[in-house]
Each structure stands twice: as structure tokens, then as C-alpha cells.
Design a protein with these regions (language model features):
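Charged interaction scaffolds used for protein-protein
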Residues: 1-228
């Protein structure tokens, strides 16, 4: 019997839940052959037992294909649909609540929880006017987290990079502001110069640590899918 494969042409066609399972396989297995088989099983929607029926040259071509589509930089999208529900990204991140920010940062740190992160950042649109829209209030991830497993992985990658990049920009702006304020304060009194200098050093170190966290998170989104 001839084996039929539906090979995704872009990350728009791969649901988040399949990529999460693939990432889990990569993190827990050192068997390159098994990882390759799981990749084809998950992304092409076939049984694992059928993967061994594929010609070796074809499998190698498929690995190259998936590496290429995962290497494409994903653009950030404000809105997308799952079934009949249209979801919108938080319209103004500068007005994000503390609860939203803490949950988003926590869940974005692990692909296992990326569906929960999507349930924080994207919520059902309740009103639309032109290009503007309103989303429902944030009340935790319980209601939509499971549904978000069907988010195209392209949406998840674009949103996570956007969030971390914006966070890095905000940190840099805050760091510049604090540095200027520290210099102003150090000029007001000679007596406090040493203590203020130490405080400034501490602030700089903390900012640098946070920047490294944001930068590492962004880089992890762009790592190669699979080597062979």
C-alpha cells in the first residue's frame, strides 16, 4: 500500500501541540534516528510505525525541508482564528497588568507551557472597530489554554519573540533612565558619591542579567530544528 504524506509547507500548518511534543522528544532523547521519526510522525500526521517505510533519501529531504521552514523568521501577528473564535494580542503592552506580565513571562520560559502563554497574550476579541479591537479581560489561562494548543506554531514563535524583544527594549530604556538619574543624584552631594556609585553598579548588574535572560529567550526561538 502506498503511503500518503501531508507535508506542511509552512509553520502556519503545524499546530503548537505537535511542536511541543517534538521539543519534548528532542529534550529527552539522544537517539537522532528516533527524533527524525518522531518529527515526521508529528508534523506529517502519520503513525510512527509507518515512518520506517519511507525511503532514507526521502526522509533526509524531509529533514532538510523542516529545517528550512523552521529557519524562516516568523512575523508577529496581532490576530488569528481557531475555529470560529478570533483571538487578539494584548492591544497595548505598555498597559499590561502585573498579573498578565508575570504569567506571560513564566509560561514563555518553557515550550511545555507555551499554550498557557498564548492564553495570556491572546484572548477572544469582543469588539472590533476598523483595525482596533478589544479583548476579554484576563482571568487566568484555565478556559482557553487547551484550545491554544491548536495555535499555529508560527503565531506562537512570532508572539514570543515580539514579547521578549519588547521586554529587552523596555529594559534598555529603563537602564538608560536609571543611569541618568544616578548621575544626577551623584552630583548633588559629594558625601554620598561612593554609596550612589555602588548603587549604580548594582543596578547595572541587575539590568545586564535581565537583558541576558531576554536575549537567551529570543535566541532559543531561532535555534536549528534538527541536525543530521
Amino acid at each position: 500500500m502506498k503511503l500518503e504524506l501531508l507535508i506542511p509547507t509552512s509553520l502556519d500548518e503545524i499546530p503548537l501541540k505537535h511542536y511541543q511534543e517534538f521539543r519534548k522528544t528532542v529534550d529527552t532523547s539522544n537517539d537522532a534516528e528516533f527524533i527524525s521519526e518522531k518529527m515526521v510522525q508529528l508534523f506529517c500526521g502519520i503513525e510512527l510505525k509507518d515512518v520506517v517505510k519511507i525511503k532514507a533519501t526521502d526522509l533526509s529531504d524531509m529533514i532538510d525541508h523542516f529545517n528550512r521552514i523552521f529557519a524562516v523568521k516568523q512575523t508577529f501577528k496581532h490576530r488569528f482564528k481557531i475555529g470560529d473564535i478570533e483571538f487578539g494580542f494584548i492591544p497595548n503592552l505598555e498597559q499590561i497588568s502585573w498579573g498578565e506580565y508575570i504569567d506571560a513571562e513564566k509560561y514563555l520560559s518553557s515550550w511545555d507551557n507555551m499554550h498557557k502563554a498564548m492564553a495570556v497574550l491572546y484572548r477572544p476579541i469582543k469588539n472590533t472597530k476598523g483595525d482596533k479591537y478589544e479583548i476579554i479581560d484576563y482571568e487566568g489561562t484555565g478556559e482557553y489554554a487547551e484550545l491554544m494548543k491548536f495555535t499555529p506554531v508560527s503565531i506562537a514563535m512570532g508572539a514570543s519573540v515580539f514579547f521578549w524583544t519588547l521586554g529587552l527594549e523596555l529594559l534598555e530604556a529603563l537602564g538608560d533612565y536609571l543611569e541618568k538619574e544616578t548621575k544626577k543624584m551623584s552630583k548633588t552631594t559629594t558625601a554620598n558619591k561612593r554609596s550612589l556609585g555602588n548603587s549604580g553598579d548594582g543596578i547595572s548588574q541587575s539590568m545586564q542579567q535581565l537583558k541576558e535572560i531576554f536575549s537567551t529567550s529570543i535566541e532559543s526561538q531561532n535555534s536549528p530544528l534538527l541536525k543530521h
